[in-house]
UniProtKB/Swiss-Prot annotation:
Protein name: RNA-binding protein 45
Gene Ontology biological process terms, A to Z: cell differentiation; nervous system development
Keyword Cytoplasm: yes
GO cellular component: cytoplasm; nucleoplasm; nucleus; ribonucleoprotein complex
Stretch list, region Disordered: 1-20
Keywords for the protein's UniProt record, in alphabetical order: Cytoplasm, Developmental protein, Differentiation, Isopeptide bond, Neurogenesis, Nucleus, Phosphoprotein, Repeat, RNA-binding, Ubl conjugation
Gene: RBM45
Function field: RNA-binding protein with binding specificity for poly(C). May play an important role in neural development.
Length: 476
């Protein structure tokens, strides 16, 4: 994808490639009509702050707009406020299609997924050891509505370590706090919750001088770790991050790109491999992949067996767990069952007819799909007849992979009046059809941005079939 962009006359400073993400999270990514001119973008987004540049992505050969653009602001808070207020809005009276606005991923981050709102609302600060949570709240409430504050304490003595977290309701509020709070707080955007606390503190102290100068925090070597962070519970307050998150899913990173077949052949050594997927990074030559096993025991064995494995010779691959929101404290209690499951997986490995009926929890009959999530879901409801007229269609995006169809149906039928839910072959997207708009809106309100079975969902209203047929095929 080639980016062709220009600054309108009088646009002022245009940042170089090295400063596109300076300060961090100051660039927004837009999905717009391919007929929207740059002048309209500048007019609609300039009220939010100082626009340094606008890029419109164009076709390499025809030079036509692809309906994608980037807007670079001078400050992160300006970009965040633009995202909050313009996402889902229409740009003009003749443009009735709502636009989509996201914070653009850093070009050097090693990841090409969207930056989620939850990742932009929590800040990490250095505070006096005498501070209470109420003191922390009092200092930072001037920048916006605070969801919670927490102070990191010594597990043995219970004394404050002089570090804390503040989570705001909006990304723009967190950005305002970082930009405007007293420099002695050394405020930075917090790392994902599943990163070990000792590592977070070491990163914080080693990069304090860099952060004070406004540089971006160090990028995680394993970009997929932490994508599926759960909603806030008691995670920060009990300071339980010292233990590595363990799950059935693994992130694989290599300095040398690999194909899906190569990835499969490496991890198929361990029985119980469910699927593997290669992630393409347009900004580097690194290889990224996600591997999932049917059970935790197989994933643990694969992680410790293959982390550091040389493939090809001289190139060590990095393997780490991806937090799927499961509770690691239950691991020992469940390990015996999981080990038996791993043995069963090995026994039926060469018998596909048994594999398709095998349930790796010990049962082999038909079972309702199990849903693991912090989301409060309604009870199951009957589906609407297949011939029922469709009142609303929902577009579903999965990260990093689609959920099984039976799980999807179980989730989306709970809102009532579901006609059908289906996946698009070869894509991480799907659709749900409802016979009632209220049911569809309830599904969006409950599920958008949430994590179910380790998969983050984006649920939004789909374009009408007529509109979709006139558009170029999207890539995700």
């Amino acid at each position: 994808m080639d980016e062709a962009g220009s600054s309108a006359s009088g646009g002022g400073f245009r940042p170089g490639v090295d400063s596109l993400d300076e300060p961090p999270n100051s660039r927004i990514f837009l999905v717009i009509s391919k007929y929207t001119p740059e002048s309209v973008l500048r007019e609609r987004f300039s009220p939010f702050g100082d626009i340094q540049d606008i890029w419109v992505v164009r076709d390499k050969h025809t030079k036509e707009s692809k309906g994608i653009a980037f807007v670079k602001f001078a400050r992160s808070s300006q970009a965040c406020r633009a995202m909050e207020e313009m996402h889902g809005q229409c740009l003009g009276p003749n443009d009735t299609k709502p636009i989509k606005v996201f914070i653009a991923q850093s070009r050097s981050s090693g990841s090409h997924r969207d930056v989620e709102d939850e990742e932009l609302t929590r800040i990490f600060v250095m505070i006096p050891k005498s501070y209470t949570e109420e003191d922390l709240r009092e200092k930072f409430k001037v920048y916006g509505d605070i969801e919670y504050c927490s102070i990191i304490k010594n597990k043995v003595t219970g004394e404050s370590k002089g570090l804390g977290y503040v989570r705001y309701l909006k990304p723009s509020q967190a950005a305002q706090a970082i930009e405007n709070c007293d420099r002695s707080f050394r405020a930075i955007l917090a790392e994902p919750k599943n990163k070990a606390s000792e590592s977070s503190e070491q990163d914080y102290y080693s990069n304090m001088r860099q952060e004070a100068l406004g540089h971006e925090p160090r990028v995680n070597m394993f970009p997929f770790v932490g994508e599926q962070q759960s909603e806030f519970s008691s995670f920060d307050k009990n300071d339980s991050r010292g233990q590595e998150a363990i799950s059935k899913r693994l992130s694989v990173v290599s300095r040398v790109p690999f194909t899906e077949e190569q990835l499969f052949s490496i991890f198929d050594i361990v029985p119980g491999l469910e699927y593997c997927e290669v992630q393409r990074d347009p900004y580097s030559n690194y290889g990224h992949g996600v591997v999932q096993y049917f059970n935790v025991a197989s994933a643990i064995y694969a992680k410790y067996k293959l982390h550091g494995f040389q493939y090809p010779p001289g190139n060590r691959i990095g393997v780490s767990f991806i937090d799927d929101g499961s509770n690691a404290t239950d691991l020992l209690r469940k390990m015996a069952t999981q080990m038996v499951a791993a043995q069963l997986a090995s026994m039926v490995w060469n018998n596909p007819s048994q594999q398709q009926f095998m349930q790796f929890g010990g049962s082999s009959g038909s079972q309702l799909p199990q849903i693991q999530t912090d989301v409060v879901l309604p009870s199951c409801k009957k589906k609407a007849p297949a011939e029922t007229p469709v009142k609303e269609r929902l577009f579903i995006v999965f990260n990093p992979h689609p959920l099984p169809l039976d799980v999807l149906e179980d989730i989306f039928c709970r809102f009532g009046n579901l006609i059908e839910v289906y996946l698009v072959s070869g894509k991480n997207v799907g659709y749900a059809k409802y016979a009632d708009r209220i049911s569809a809106n309830d599904a969006i309100a409950t599920l958008h941005g949430k994590i179910l079975n380790g998969v983050r969902l984006k649920v939004m209203l789909a374009d009408s079939p007529r509109e979709e047929s006139n558009k170029r095929q999207r890539t995700y």
